[in-house]
Amino acid sequence: MVSIQLELLKFGWMTTKDFFYLNRPDLKNTEIGDIQERLDFRKEKGCKPFKWFLENVYPQKYVPDDPTYVLGYGRIINPKSGNCIDTLQNEEKDEYDLGFYPCHSFSSASQFFSFSRKGEIRGEESCATIDLGEMRTHKVRMTPCNGLSIQKWEYVGNRFIHKDTRLCLEGIVGGEFLRSAPCKISSSQLWILENDYEES
């Protein structure tokens, strides 16, 4: 019953559905029946769309696929290896090392990131940073977003360059985790944003 209610909410009120399915792929093929009555109710009452709610009631909510907030979103792919940046199923609220894992053939929350207009590689509330306490290993960690420069990156020539250290994001095949390394001409440092608004 809860599944059907969520589906009705999504179809009746939400204007974007892709992000919904990313977090609840189990509902993608749920049969919900005719919802025309609900859509007519919304139109008849002049109900505002979900975007209005985000802009007027909850403006501090980060929307990971909205071009108002992001330059790109989706999988961040290393084309040479076919691997993607991955949370390795870690929880958003936890601090953890970012993984480097074969890209899924389907949308997956563990490989969904956005590159914000503020220069953050981020999930909903966590941002990629270089663990300065681990400069020997140069691991890249997800930590709560704080707006500080330690979480800022530039995306130039398909490279993510950390603003403070000038190190590049690197994925090594056979390595479980991402790292940062001195920038060089190497396919291990090239990345594609799956949905890049700047390329559109």
Regions found by a protein language model. Give the residues of each.
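Catalytic cores of eukaryotic secretory-pathway lumenal/extracellular enzymes that build
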Residues: 1-58
